[in-house]
UniProtKB/Swiss-Prot annotation:
Species in which this protein is naturally found: Mus musculus (Mouse)
Name of this protein: E3 ubiquitin-protein ligase ZNF598
Lineage, opening ranks: Eukaryota, Metazoa, Chordata, Craniata, Vertebrata
Family: Belongs to the ZNF598/HEL2 family.
Phosphotyrosine, modified sites: Y304
Task performed by this protein: E3 ubiquitin-protein ligase that plays a key role in the ribosome quality control (RQC), a pathway that takes place when a ribosome has stalled during translation, leading to degradation of nascent peptide chains. ZNF598 is activated when ribosomes are stalled within an mRNA following translation of prematurely polyadenylated mRNAs. Acts as a ribosome collision sensor: specifically recognizes and binds collided di-ribosome, which arises when a trailing ribosome encounters a slower leading ribosome, leading to terminally arrest translation.
SMART domains registered for this protein in UniProt: ZnF_C2H2
Self-association and partners: Interacts with the E2 ubiquitin-conjugating enzyme UBE2D3. Component of the 4EHP-GYF2 complex, at least composed of EIF4E2, GIGYF2 and ZNF598.
Gene name, Swiss-Prot/TrEMBL: Znf598
Lineage: superkingdom: Eukaryota
Length: 908
């Protein structure tokens, strides 16, 4: 024990001799003078300032030289080795474990931690830094930087105090005397400054978002919230937004498309049932109640349902009788389900076969020689169950089948027009039969005449008598297919057959009711189910009339086209007024065979309107029908308007209901033994040639003449509207394709919307704003003038003048597009007329303009400096780029009434 103590004493003596005296020199950390030394167990001396800053301000107790943890340190001026210092005898700071060698060193330590005012040395030190800060703000208007106060661990005497201006410069740019500090950086998302870039980066990483793909590539892009980061993922990378991934963050973004596909395959793959369920579309629809057709001898689905119910009841009875035996047999339920499936499959097959049979029957009926309008009149009163019944007139009793609304019908109501035989019959209606009768398919070109019968006052109905034998629905006779080029019919028999055909259409299956009774019956009938046989019908709406609404052309329509010989005989000897009247009244009879006709008038009292009155009848009748919206040739109206039969353009409709049938006196013979008058062929609204007048002028320049020689009587007809609609290289005219009385311009039709209508409107508005230099007052004035012109409050000339006043010479640059995008054909014509008048006033008139002054629409738009053309069919002003699409719209609409050349090509 004594030996150990002696060895320890000798080691301490050697260390005391070998260790140099602590004190003097400079600090290895701050390079300052060592007024007082801080020494720890590792014997690495540092100045007391650095040790105090580490242990008191930074709360770090390791050695700044060797990083050894120092639990105790000694402050003194000249210190031996730490092991030789008797620390238990020294003054002690318990909070920080600092020992002081003497009182002077302790005073230096206390002075480092005092809060003294640099401007007021006579004041005692403040106990807290907050008190000093308040004193500096109130007494000296000096402030310290909050960021530096929070992050910089320095003594109070080392703090800098700034005025307001200097503090702002310090935060943004830094101190002029300290080039190492360049200000505190700003976060643009939060509008908050941080001590340095490291602190700003910590904030961005912690409180904002960055792309981990771009960050791994070295890009330093940050986003304020995840919405912007999601948009970045969507644009630059691959983002999954299916199912739960639409609400996930970070994990639903992928670097490559292959990773995205692998993710979708792994996480979003569905089973076949789920995929099939996702492809299904739920449709809410209902069927009208289906009436039984058992009385007509047709096997329907109700028969199968009745058999199925009987089988189920029989199985239930047998099951109650031998319940124990069926309990032992476990497969009876499976057999029952198999039987149910077989019955359901049989029902579906039967219903499909029945629908196919009905469709075939309707198509056969349409392909027969029955006229379209008579087929419509026969379909509308048809009922699904029971016998076929005819509509009754108002005031008719329930016992009578059919009676005249104006009393008994005499022979004068249906006079014969020729010397043909007259057959008078008085009988009741024949019993209905499923076979088609000859009345449903009258021949239009029969050589023999059959007139309507006279009915005695005691008769109950009317029936037609035909000289030919009755035929089945699929039996065709020779008179149903007349020769296309044949000799002219006999003068005496042809008018008789024509009148017989109109009267058979008017009195088919009996006398016709009044318009009021027809409307009542039509409103009381149940709607027919829209099936495959109905063309163009709508679900739950009224039944379609016939194939005419869909624009088709049946065999009967082809046969109703007159031959070239018959048309040429029609065109030659007729007068203007009488032939136009006969053509119109016969078209009314052919288009509406089920409607009543005009009252009885003698031939000398028949009104003969002039050509202008005939043209103006169509707009007057159009104003009374319900308004429909026409977009690119397709009408968007009510179901009642759609269900009405379509009429060819130019056909005036009657202004009101007429109570009496058409008498023969309304169709007088115009030329004695001349051929019969027939309605104009399809594609021609009115064909008029004045007797003794020169033929119409030749086609205007720009229209291509027909390729082949026209048939006799058609030398003055122009080509179809399809070729006339295309602009010519030299000039563009508005000549229509139908032969008209000279001086009559075609009526403007509905506006057909061109392609890219909305985008072009926006471009036009932007061009107007640019020309007005974004002047809102001028633009508002332009819009008000445009609205007044559209509403008819100002004329086209006033509107044209106001636009020129606003836009000046720039108006000429946008006038063509403004005119083409004006959604009103009539307003287009007015505005073009105003432009033509302005150009005629600007330029001196020459001989050519005087020659064309008769019709302003024959003036070329290119001569007026316009980049547009006028459609000769509907009078719509078009840009040159819109001509082809506009022509296609007309071609689609003209399929309902094709030209004679198209019919000839179809027949041959």
């Amino acid at each position: 024990m004594a030996a150990a103590a002696g060895a320890e004493g000798r080691r301490a003596a050697l260390e005391a001799v070998a260790a140099p005296e602590r004190g003097g020199g400079s600090c290895v950390l701050c390079c300052g003078d060592l007024e007082a030394t801080a020494l720890g167990r590792c014997d690495h001396p540092v100045c007391y300032r650095c040790s105090t800053k580490m242990r008191v301000l930074c709360e770090q107790r390791y050695c700044a030289v060797c990083r050894e943890e120092l639990r105790q340190v000694v402050f003194g001026k000249k210190l031996p080795a730490f092991a030789l210092i008797p620390i238990h005898q020294l003054q002690h700071e318990k909070k920080y474990d600092i020992y002081f060698a003497d009182g002077k060193v302790f005073a230096l330590y206390r002075q480092l931690l005092q809060h003294e005012c640099p401007r007021c040395p006579h004041l005692p030190p403040f106990s807290l830094f907050g008190d000093l800060e308040q004193h500096m703000r109130k007494q000296h208007e000096l402030f310290c930087c909050k960021l530096c106060l929070k992050h910089l661990k320095i003594f109070t005497y080392e703090r800098k105090w700034y005025s307001r201006k200097d503090l702002a410069r310090h935060r943004m740019q830094g101190d002029p005397d300290d080039t190492s500090h360049r200000g505190h950086p700003l976060c643009k998302f939060c509008d908050e400054r941080y001590l340095d870039n490291d602190e700003l980066l910590k904030h961005l990483r912690r409180d904002h978002y960055f792309c981990h793909f771009c960050d791994s590539d070295g890009a330093q892009d940050y986003y304020s919230d995840y919405a912007y980061l999601r948009e970045h993922f969507r644009e630059k990378h691959f983002l999954c937004e299916e199912g739960r991934c639409s609400t996930e963050q970070f994990t639903h973004a992928f670097r490559t498309e292959i990773d995205l596909k692998a993710h979708k395959t792994a996480c979003h793959s569905r089973s076949r049932a789920e995929a099939r369920q996702n492809r299904q579309i739920d449709l809410q629809f209902s069927f009208a109640p289906r009436h039984s057709r058992r009385s007509e001898g047709v096997v329907s689905g109700e028969d199968y349902e009745e058999v199925d119910r009987y089988n189920r009841q029989g199985r239930a009875g047998r099951a109650s009788g031998r319940g124990a035996q069926q309990n032992r047999r476990g497969s009876w339920r499976y057999k029952r389900e198999e039987e149910d499936r077989e019955v359901a499959a049989a029902i579906r097959a039967s219903v499909a076969a029945q629908q196919q049979e009905e469709t075939q029957r309707v198509e056969d009926r349409e392909e027969g020689s029955r006229p379209k309008k008579e087929e419509a009149a026969a379909r509308v009163p048809e009922e699904p169950r029971g016998h076929r019944r005819l509509p009754r007139a108002q005031g008719e009793g329930s016992g009578s089948k059919e009676a005249s609304a104006n009393g008994p019908v005499s022979q004068e109501a249906f006079p014969a027009t020729g010397p043909g035989p007259v057959v008078a019959l008085s009988n009741t209606l024949p019993p209905p039969s499923p076979e088609l009768k000859e009345e449903d398919f009258p021949s239009l070109c029969a050589s023999t005449s059959s007139c309507c019968t006279a009915v005695t006052p005691g008769s109950v109905g009317l029936a037609l008598a035909y000289p030919g034998p009755p035929r089945g629905k699929n039996t065709f006779q020779e008179e149903d297919f007349p020769a296309l080029v044949s000799s002219a019919p006999k003068p005496s028999s042809a008018p008789s057959s024509l009148i017989s055909a109109w009267n058979s259409g008017c009195s088919k299956k009996g006398n016709l009711p009044t318009p009021g009774s027809q409307a009542v019956v039509g409103g009381s009938q149940p709607p027919r189910k829209a099936g495959k046989g109905s063309r163009g019908g709508r679900k739950g709406g009224p039944a379609p009339v016939d194939e005419e609404d869909s624009g088709g052309l049946t065999v009967q329509g082809l046969r109703s086209v007159p031959t070239t010989v018959a048309v040429s005989s029609l065109l030659a000897p007729a007068t203007n007024q009488s032939s136009a009247k006969v053509g119109k009244k016969k078209k009314v009879g052919s288009e509406k065979p089920g409607a009543t006709s005009s009252p009885l008038l003698p031939p000398d009292h028949t009104p003969k309107p002039s050509g202008a009155e005939q043209v103006l009848e169509a707009p007057l009748s159009k104003a009374e029908v319900p308004v429909t919206i026409v977009v690119n040739g397709h009408s968007e109206g009510s179901a009642l308007v759609r269900s009405a039969p379509k009429e060819p353009p130019g056909l005036p409709r009657p202004l009101g209901p007429l109570p009496c049938p058409i008498p023969q006196e309304d169709f007088p013979a115009l030329g004695g033994p001349c051929p019969p008058r027939m309605p104009p062929p399809p594609g021609f609204s009115t064909v008029v040639l004045l007797k003794g007048t020169p033929p119409p002028p030749p086609p205007p320049p720009g229209l291509v003449p027909p390729i082949s020689k026209p048939p006799p009587g058609f030398s003055s007809l122009l080509p179809s509207s399809h070729s006339a609609c295309a602009p010519s290289p030299t000039t563009t005219t508005t000549t229509t394709t139908t032969t008209k009385t000279p001086g009559l311009a075609p009526t403007p039709q509905a506006y057909l919307v061109p392609e890219n209508f909305r985008e072009r409107n926006l471009q036009l508005i932007q061009s107007i704003k640019d020309f007005l230099q974004s002047d809102e007052a001028c633009f508002s004035k332009f819009k008000s003038h445009s609205g007044e012109f559209r509403q008819g409050m100002i004329s086209a000339a006033q509107y044209y003048k106001s636009c020129r006043d606003l836009l000046g010479e720039s108006f000429q640059k946008i006038f063509s597009e403004l005119l083409a995008l004006l959604p009103d054909t009539a307003k287009q014509q007015e505005l073009l007329s105003a432009h033509t008048d302005f150009c005629s006033r600007e330029k001196p008139p020459n001989s050519r303009s005087k020659r064309n002054k008769k019709n302003v629409w024959q003036t070329s738009t290119q001569q007026l400096g316009l980049d547009c053309c006028v459609c000769p069919t509907c009078q719509q002003v078009l840009a040159h780029g819109d001509v082809s699409s506009h022509q296609a719209l007309h071609a689609a609409r003209d399929d309902d009434f094709p030209s004679l050349q198209a019919i000839a090509r179809i027949i041959t």
